[in-house]
């Protein structure tokens, strides 16, 4: 008993410290000036490859930026027509965006032979960069959000979008004051830890971190459920276990 008491006190102290540290991190996550993000009212463009990317991978970022009062736009580079379901998937995308708070007028879907929904086709990053820049300039965008070089799942279309924003930045073509955030790809184990990945996400380097509340997580689930044509059994498991349904870590280019 004499030995147990100090150990219990130590455990309690560690627990309190952990709670305070997580709370402090949460405070930093919800303050745009501390996170290095543009302030409220800023126009943010999410750039995705396929309908359902916005819900499968970026829901924490979308809802986190909405929490910070960003005006959100979505540019989807394909209609997701790999299985000839393009028309269905466009409607599902608009429904998902509505759940996530992005109005139809702010959703742009590209249907161009240069950008087929096909993991075996490498999109031309220069062509993608030109299209992306047009939308950035036309909408007065201050923040672009897209995939990192790993593309989360390694899909070649995701990776091409990262190459496109890197091309724009390297050539100095982005408008003054426009920054780029990329979504961190993580290893397979972390990818399916859901909220258990939070300690790793807090400890490891990143420029921005968004973690959904329980209510927001339910909203993300509803958005993903709009993509009925894609809800095969393994995607239902993904919805339950993937950290990307609850946590997004991002870095500035």
Curated annotation (Swiss-Prot):
Keyword Transferase in record: no
Family annotation (InterPro entries): GlcNAc_PI_deacetylase-related, LmbE-like_dom_sf
Membrane topology: Single-pass type I membrane protein
Catalytic activity: a 6-(N-acetyl-alpha-D-glucosaminyl)-1-(1,2-diacyl-sn-glycero-3-phospho)-1D-myo-inositol + H2O = a 6-(alpha-D-glucosaminyl)-1-(1,2-diacyl-sn-glycero-3-phospho)-1D-myo-inositol + acetate
Enzyme Commission number(s): 3.5.1.89
One GO location term (cellular component): endoplasmic reticulum membrane
Membrane side Cytoplasmic: residue ranges: 24-253
Spans through the membrane: 3-23
Pathway the protein contributes to: Glycolipid biosynthesis; glycosylphosphatidylinositol-anchor biosynthesis
Function field: Catalyzes the second step of glycosylphosphatidylinositol (GPI) biosynthesis, which is the de-N-acetylation of N-acetylglucosaminyl-phosphatidylinositol.
Family affiliation: Belongs to the PIGL family.
Entry protein name: N-acetylglucosaminyl-phosphatidylinositol de-N-acetylase
Organism: Bos taurus
